[in-house]
Amino acid sequence: GLLETTLGRASRDGRAHLFTVFGEPGVGKSRLVREFCDGLEHVTVLAGRCLPYGQSITYWPVAEMVKTVAGISDSDPVEEAFAKLQACCESEAVADLLGLAAGVLEAVEQVRGQDEIAWAVHAFVEQLAEPQPVVLVFEDIHWAEDPLLDLVEHLADRVRAPLLLLC
């Protein structure tokens, strides 16, 4: 189908592709995405859910993805969570910024700008995509705050690695 073709193009071109699934509530968008992802082999699939307005956790879906890769659980003490994050990042600066974005460390946007967080996520995704293609699934993107939408757009425009952004 179209999703498979788009992922194939991302893999062949070695660059990011953005794919948005539109439809009325209850029409089966989530099921379509889940079935597509379940059928993938030799692809890293990470998913994160955007929270409803008022939750004010801008990068929550990114945090879920980063925690999955690093093997961080919500019960981990901060020191242990950050050690796991550092172990899976090639750069300490990337680990620091992802720690902020993931809420492992305190004070995200006040201390670090959106551009810095975008740079860190970009570097992290390119590192992840070195061995095999990556699919990032942003669930409930209609709840996303502007900085997250800007980040998705940044990744779509600038990542030079086999990446499918699925919203």
Language-model features: where?
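Key residue(s) within conserved catalytic/signature motifs
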Residues: 1-167
